[in-house]
């Protein structure tokens, strides 16, 4: 989760005192990197995935499942057995926000050959097996986006009570600080977001109104005036960073051949973010209730919203410099490529001084405004040992701001003094239950980048429409019911060349008829006379590539999953979870997920992930039979 400096974190007051210093030197660090590597060309498209995991413990006797707060120990063991012993170890492990979470990536990035698509799932399996092997009895590693009873009494092992007093990090009524990773960055981030904002974060998720759900659904918090004021009727109220950053996701990073190719990919993939988010929907439950959303995006956005009342437009600007329209965790606000410029229709708040400085240094308008927009934010954490840095050889101040702008896409300059290229990160996906599904989504997105670059595809639409798509994508059953703005003609005779656009696209105003509302089924699978469909385009690309039979078979299985999820033939994880709860004998049709129901659901998820049972409605019939059995969590093992 971004920069992980070691050392002594400064208080919020001290961090604030150094904010201008961090911004000033962050820009100098960016300029050093930019001038050193702006002409760097890489031959190979490298890429890698990141999977976030939750550690859980099953109490089979009392039919209860809890989040296991030993991520630190598990991580230490995995790193000791892996990368510290062998620098070429096939997996890498990193800490995540929750003390019940870990993040796993392949040890080396994948390269440009088609056969590498066949190694993704094997590597994910290796990660799952490796981490599971260091767990105790009745413990399991799960790829679940949101734990349904996160924030309910006794949801952690060991159990801890929340401490809503000022001294803590979260001050939450529901989320104990012990559930936050012990690395000083995470607790400090949590505390400083709250201090900067001037109050606790506020998350209100609409409740799903079932037959017996009270109407209006109202929770009262007599002991907490802040919560009483912030919570809304018919909404599930949450008050801590952990409710967002304590969820798991699936991300992919690509190294492009050049800075211009990275900027082009950044823009093209930004329009794909809401589509893939809806396709990967996997988080319908929050704080023990069934919600009316299927994706975590808005929850995580609110969970780290450090904007003050002035910045949110609730009070006149007095102490702050800017009105800021979005949380630091949200969709992108500007395209970076020349082709994207005319579609930049969102008002962009920028630091004008930084913008002018970047222009003077020879950086073009589009990249300058992107960086000047990121740098309207304050640093949220600062370590005493990391204040004075060598700007020519270090980038911690730049990364401090860059890595706490959590957007749908991230444009990543190379680290100083490395041979890494310009990268983009694709960030909106929800993690799936199985390695097969996670591989399918990763391979789909990576293949799409290949096709975008090979066929010079153009998905650009006004950025305000992408934002509208993001709102639709989070709704319940968006994959089947949502309509999304999408470009009609994506193959304009190879207009979208990487280093600029041809004359055919030079009109300054995007035409409204360039895009229209489509269903995800149309976007993914195509509709005659309307849109060719992304999967048919991927298939035609594959037909023209040299691909061995085995790899082709794997890729086609992955694309079949995406195709069937888009058409509704297979369920999303979110829909499947909703059906599971609705059909549970203990469910009272009141939108409440009890310990017993939660246990049944997570146990079932674990069995599906370990391939101990089939789930045709999620994965298709005839999906692989059990490959291995008797995981450590199994009561009969």
From Swiss-Prot:
What EC number is given for this enzyme? 6.3.2.2
N-acetylmethionine PTM sites in chain numbering: 1
Record keyword ATP-binding present: yes
Give the activity regulation note.
Answer: Feedback inhibition by glutathione.
Q: What class of enzyme is it?
A: ligase
Recorded GO cellular component terms are:
cytosol; glutamate-cysteine ligase complex; mitochondrion
- In this chain, where does the modification Phosphoserine occur? 5, 8
Q: Coiled-coil intervals in this record?
A: none
Q: Name one GO molecular function term.
A: ATP binding
The record, for InterPro entries, names:
GCS, Gln_synth/guanido_kin_cat_dom
Q: Which PANTHER family match?
A: GLUTAMATE CYSTEINE LIGASE, GLUTAMATE--CYSTEINE LIGASE CATALYTIC SUBUNIT
Q: Which family does it belong to?
A: Belongs to the glutamate--cysteine ligase type 3 family.
Subunit notes for this chain? Answer: Heterodimer of a catalytic heavy chain and a regulatory light chain.
Protein purpose: Catalyzes the ATP-dependent ligation of L-glutamate and L-cysteine and participates in the first and rate-limiting step in glutathione biosynthesis.
Protein's recorded name: Glutamate--cysteine ligase catalytic subunit
């Amino acid at each position: 989760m971004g920069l992980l400096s070691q050392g002594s974190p400064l208080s919020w007051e001290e961090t604030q005192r150094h904010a201008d210093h961090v911004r000033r030197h962050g820009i100098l660090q960016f300029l050093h990197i930019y001038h050193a590597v702006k002409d760097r060309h890489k031959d190979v498209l490298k890429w890698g995935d990141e999977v976030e995991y939750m550690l859980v413990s099953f109490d089979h006797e009392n039919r209860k499942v809890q989040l296991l707060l030993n991520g630190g120990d598990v991580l230490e063991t995995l790193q000791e057995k892996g990368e510290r012993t062998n620098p070429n170890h096939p997996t890498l492990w990193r800490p995540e926000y929750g003390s019940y979470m870990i993040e796993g990536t392949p040890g080396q990035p994948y390269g440009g050959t088609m056969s590498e698509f066949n190694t993704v799932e094997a590597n994910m399996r290796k990660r799952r097996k490796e981490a599971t092997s260091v767990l105790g009895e009745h413990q399991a590693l799960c790829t679940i986006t949101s734990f349904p009873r996160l924030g309910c009494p006794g949801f952690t092992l060991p159990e801890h009570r929340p401490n809503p007093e000022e001294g803590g990090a979260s001050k939450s009524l529901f989320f104990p600080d012990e559930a936050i990773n012990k690395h000083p960055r995470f607790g400090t981030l949590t505390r400083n977001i709250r201090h900067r904002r001037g109050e606790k974060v506020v998350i209100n998720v609409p409740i799903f109104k079932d037959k017996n759900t009270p109407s209006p659904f109202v929770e009262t918090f007599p002991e907490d005036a802040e919560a009483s004021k912030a919570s809304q009727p018919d909404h599930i109220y949450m008050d801590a960073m952990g409710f967002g950053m304590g969820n798991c996701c699936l991300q992919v990073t690509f190294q492009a051949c050049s800075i211009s190719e990275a900027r082009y990919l950044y823009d093209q993939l930004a329009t794909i973010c809401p589509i893939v988010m809806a396709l990967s929907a996997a988080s319908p439950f929050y704080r023990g209730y069934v919600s009316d959303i299927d994706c975590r995006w808005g929850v995580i956005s609110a969970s780290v919203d450090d904007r003050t009342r002035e910045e949110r437009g609730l009070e006149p600007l007095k102490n702050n410099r800017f009105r800021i329209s979005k949380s630091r965790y949200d969709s992108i606000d500007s395209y970076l490529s020349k082709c994207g410029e005319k579609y930049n229709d969102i008002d962009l708040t920028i630091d004008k001084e930084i913008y002018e400085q970047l222009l003077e240094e020879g950086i073009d308008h589009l990249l300058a405004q992107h960086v000047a927009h990121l740098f309207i934010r304050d640093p949220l954490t600062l370590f005493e040992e990391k204040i004075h840095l060598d700007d020519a050889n270090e980038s911690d101040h730049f990364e401090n701001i860059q890595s706490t702008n959590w957007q749908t896409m991230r444009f990543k300059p190379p680290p100083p003094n490395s041979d890494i290229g310009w990268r983009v990160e694709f960030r909106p996906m929800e993690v799936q239950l199985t390695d097969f599904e996670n591989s399918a989504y990763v391979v789909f997105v990576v293949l799409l980048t290949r096709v975008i670059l090979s066929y010079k595809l153009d998905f650009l639409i006004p950025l305000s429409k992408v934002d509208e798509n993001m709102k639709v994508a989070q709704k319940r059953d968006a994959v089947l019911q949502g309509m999304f703005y999408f470009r009609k003609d994506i193959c304009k005779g190879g207009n979208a060349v990487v280093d600029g656009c041809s004359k055919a696209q030079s009109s300054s105003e995007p035409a409204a008829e360039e895009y229209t509302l489509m269903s995800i089924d149309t976007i993914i699978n195509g509709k005659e006379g309307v849109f060719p469909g992304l999967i048919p385009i991927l298939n035609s690309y594959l037909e023209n590539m040299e691909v061995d039979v085995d790899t082709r078979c794997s890729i086609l299985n992955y694309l079949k999953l995406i195709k069937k999820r888009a058409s509704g033939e297979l369920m999303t994880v979110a829909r499947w979870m909703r059906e599971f709860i609705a059909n549970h004998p203990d469910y009272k049709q009141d939108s409440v997920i009890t310990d017993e129901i939660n246990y049944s659901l997570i146990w079932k998820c674990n069995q599906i992930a370990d391939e101990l049972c089939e789930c045709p409605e999620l994965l298709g019939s005839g999906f692989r039979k059990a490959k291995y059995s008797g995981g450590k969590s199994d009561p009969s093992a």
